[in-house]
Amino acid sequence: MTSSDKSLSHDVFVYGSFQEPSVVNLILECSPVMVPAQLHGYHVYRLKGRLHACISPSENGLINGKILTGLTDSQLENLDMIEGSEYVRKTVEVVLTDTSEKKQVETYVWANKDDPNLYGEWDFEEWRRLHMDKFIEASTKFIEWKKNPDGRSREEFEKFVFDDPPTAA
């Protein structure tokens, strides 16, 4: 591997909460360039009891989202960690909204396409109005944990992305 290979950047198609600049800036610790794009052949679902969206293949599906361009390996690792094992990062083809150019990018697809918790259609504006603050709080805690785990497990922080996590009596 040459030194130039190490500096390859990543382009990632995002949908759901990662379309919100304040969320992306927090997770990536920078303000990446965001380019509007569409992903054909997928549907963006709600997840029962969760604050975030997921996508799964759907023959006639169309998702409007954004491409985060020029991400570093470290930034991609942040996305991988926050998405966790319930998502699979895969290469897809998107169409740039402004130019109709096709582009190969990576995105996060829900690993269990038959998950009974998938339903309906996730709504960005509704999420922004009702859940964004809680999601930003959870993301902040996750980034703090990544920097200093202090013996705590990732699972302790996963509960923050639930709409109404169980509480102790």
From Swiss-Prot:
Q: Which CDD domains match?
A: GGCT_like
Which positions bind substrate? 15-20
InterPro entries, sorted: AIG2-like (IPR045038), AIG2-like_dom (IPR009288), GGCT-like (IPR013024), GGCT-like_sf (IPR036568)
Q: What induces it?
A: Up-regulated by biotic and chemical treatments.
Looking up SUPFAM superfamilies in the UniProt record yields: Gamma-glutamyl cyclotransferase-like
Top-rank taxon, per record: Eukaryota
The EC code for this enzyme is 2.3.2.-
Key words, A-Z:
Acyltransferase, Transferase
Catalytic positions are 83 (proton acceptor)
A family per Pfam: GGACT
Tissues of expression = Expressed in roots, leaves and stems.
What's the top EC group for this one?
A: transferase
List, in alphabetical order, the Gene Ontology terms for molecular function in this entry: acyltransferase activity; protein domain specific binding
Q: Which GO terms describe its cellular component?
A: cytosol; plasma membrane
List where the protein spans the membrane: none
Stated family: Belongs to the gamma-glutamylcyclotransferase family.
Job description of the protein? Putative gamma-glutamylcyclotransferase.
Protein known as? Protein AIG2 B
User: What is the originating organism of this protein?
Assistant: Arabidopsis thaliana
Query: Gene behind this chain?
Result: AIG2B
